[in-house]
Amino acid sequence: MGSEMCIRDSCYTMYMQQNNDVLFNLLDSHDTERLMNRFHDLDKFYQQLAILFTLPGSPCIYYGTEIAMEGAHDPDCRRCMPWSEIESKENQEKIAMMRKLIMLRRNEKMCRSPHFHFPDTYENDRCVEYIKLDEEGNQIEVLLNASEEKVKVKGNGKILFAREFDGEILGVNGTLIRRI
């Protein structure tokens, strides 16, 4: 497990900090398959967005991603926005989730901070945890369960964003962001 953490840390530190600060981060675009098309799973979809909104740089959301719009490689990824469906309950729930992530990034300084590390708390190699810190020492934990097993969450903190989390167990493809 330790060697994987070294690889994760070294990938980020290979670049000068001024480069990391101005990264333009995107998960889908007019030239790529849409994010939802890759997973066909909302929990995995929101895991990816949680990473996007908590890493250094500027998150970029392609139109339609806020409603988990599907689309294969170009030109299918350039489908028209389904405006007639935007008010549906399902789409409004997805938009609300996106707003939560946007507000989290806006309101929690740690989400925008370039300072983070991988503490190696969990035995499961498919459970990714990183801690974001701001200049005052405030911290948030981002925990993603990409394994096929549920994970018992260690410690506690104020939950800022969660999917597939019951207060103790992080489910398969679950996401937890909390202030610690």
Annotate each language-model stretch with its function.
Residues M1-E4, R8-D74, V142, A146:
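Conserved alpha/beta catalytic core and glycan-binding cleft of carbohydrate-active enzymes
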